[in-house]
Amino acid sequence: MPETNRLSEPTEWIDLEFVERQRTPEFAIQVGIQLYLAGLSLSNTKQYLERLGVKRSRTAIHDWVRKADLQPDCDVSPNQIAVDETVIRVNGQRHWLYAAVDAETNQFLHVRLFQTRTTQLTVLFLRELREKQQLSDTTFLIDDAAHLKAALDRLGLRFRVSRHGNRNSVERVFREVKRRTSSFSNTFSNARLPTVDSWLKAFAVWSNRCQS
């Protein structure tokens, strides 16, 4: 089980302040979150914890990830940020995943899931990113989508249309996200937008850990 190889890594990136009772040992919560985000299914994560003497349901493990409220962040101001969106399906329905990725490091800076794609929602996504990042010296790398250009223009942010080179960083991370979300309908019962959005943010944090 190669995913377990990362269990020796520091876990300071997992804030356990959400743990209200000591019914579950903190180490078990950390292990469960790590394994699930690393690629194990909820069922396999549950089985691994049982071998450690901790019996918890799949729902409990999923709730740990949700309650941890992991959010991607970055201390540096990237020179170039690749921004794009892609369709993922949850319970058979189309949703739009927006992502901003440091074009040099492939690290997620911000992710957000929407039920549709509009210029106004793109503006909202970029405003949320601007609250987290200093963007005055940043150039955004985008495709030729009209809503992306309109939103960046509206916010006075510098951008360049680019279909190759560093903009491909966002395509690479999208491939992994799609691989993981393809099983959502089999993993979550009646998955809702906030549920999937919180998982995506947690996955972004995990992905950034793998890049560092």
Feature locations, PLM:
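Acidic/histidine-rich, metal-coordinating catalytic segments
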Residues: 136-148
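Basic, short loop/linker segments at the boundary and entry of helix-turn-helix/winged-helix-like folds
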Residues: 1-37, 62-63, 76, 82
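Short conserved beta-strand segments at catalytic cores or DNA/RNA-binding microdomains
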Residues: 36, 91-118
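Major-groove recognition helix of helix-turn-helix-like DNA-binding domains
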Residues: 54-69
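Charged alpha-helix within mobile-element recombinases
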Residues: 174-212
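Two-metal-ion RNase H-like nuclease active-site motif
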Residues: 77-90, 99-101
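Active-site beta-loop-alpha junctions of metal-dependent nucleic acid enzymes
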Residues: 111-135
